[in-house]
Amino acid sequence: MPSRPWLLRLLLLMLAAVALAWLAWLGRPAEPARATPDGASATPQTPGPAQQAAVAAHGDRPEGMAAAAEPASAAPASQQPRLKPVMSEADWAAFDREWCAAMQPAREALRQGGLAALEKLPPRPLVDDDIQAAAGSQLLRRLSQALSARASPRERAVGLWLAGREAELLAEAQATRDPVIVALAAQRLRGEASAQATRLWRELEPTNMVALLHAQAIDPRPAAVWLESLASATAYEPHLTTVFQILHSVPAPTEGSPAALAQDIALVGLHAAWPLFEVGQLLKPCRRPESAPLARQCAAVAERLWALKPNDTFSPRIAFALVRAQPALRPAWEARARHAEAMAQLEMDGIDDNIEELMLRSACLAPPAPKGIMSERLRLGDAVYWSGRLPTDPAALDALVSRHRAARGGKSLLDAPPAAPTAASAPARP
């Protein structure tokens, strides 16, 4: 792998940041795309005869778009892909061709020397950052419009959330009393609207641990009372996987295209920006239990959380933090910690393992064996996706655990995380 896989990492970070920008722009009119010198952004380019022949030969697959874009590489400077305030399917097809033309140097480098050859490219992105971000925002707006027009209340609710129509989302949650819609409103609305949805969520799913954890922020009960209710939970369901399955039900303008890549990465950004419940108040009494009954409650909540098998890689860390102050429990939790550490390391490795696939996609080349890490992970949920990829060989599992602990200064997840220079200003973490 090249020492500077920054091209893809920049693409990932840039388009993931689209999610944050999108949340700030919700409900506002579409802003004009970046103007082009010739003012031609209002009309998509029509492919010439050679480009039409390439598309006819390959269709709309990545290799077809790349072939159609090749003649543009002779231009003195690459033409940046152009966006309109409102994009039709034809506009997206033109955007894909123009993206592929701009990425021609990267495509040639990959063809000739693989990832290592990208080192020779100039550091400036071949497609401007603001165009990447604008494309992601446009595609999220397209998702919102498609979902808002559907008949399913859940799909409409996801569309309302993306559109920033908060009052309508809260009204939909209260009218339908659908736990998925109510959970979405509780987790994504703000202020009193979120509090109203959270109270309704707890009413509808009183034994859902995630609903209870969100409710503790608006209902300051004694720690022992909260721990007792959490220990009796029968589910751990944020309904996040359902939301992202709905988001993935809207196909990109063209499968395998640059726009499809931009949409995938924008959804990853939404997933990464999903708010977590505050765990500080839950963990505080368990960091140094003041009594044996309180220590037993902390252990009971940890056991319950583990048994409910959260479909993410973050929540098990809460269980480890709950029992961290009780050394006598460590033997019972060691195998669980090793499993979580192996999966966490596999997740970290997965980022690098899929760099080549995403590099190829960004350069309009078809990956030889697509892994679909972004879309599949969000569709299935983190825990299901990564646990299904754990090696069965004990030695391979041990190697993953060893590497994970090495990155934590030799510490297990059952140990307190290594101190960081900015730990004092960082939020509490398990």
List PLM regions with ranges.
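Alpha-solenoid helical repeat scaffolds
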Residues: R154, V158, A183-A186, M209-Q216, ...
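Short helix-capping/linker turns of helical repeat alpha-solenoids
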Residues: R150, A175-V182, E205-M209, A215
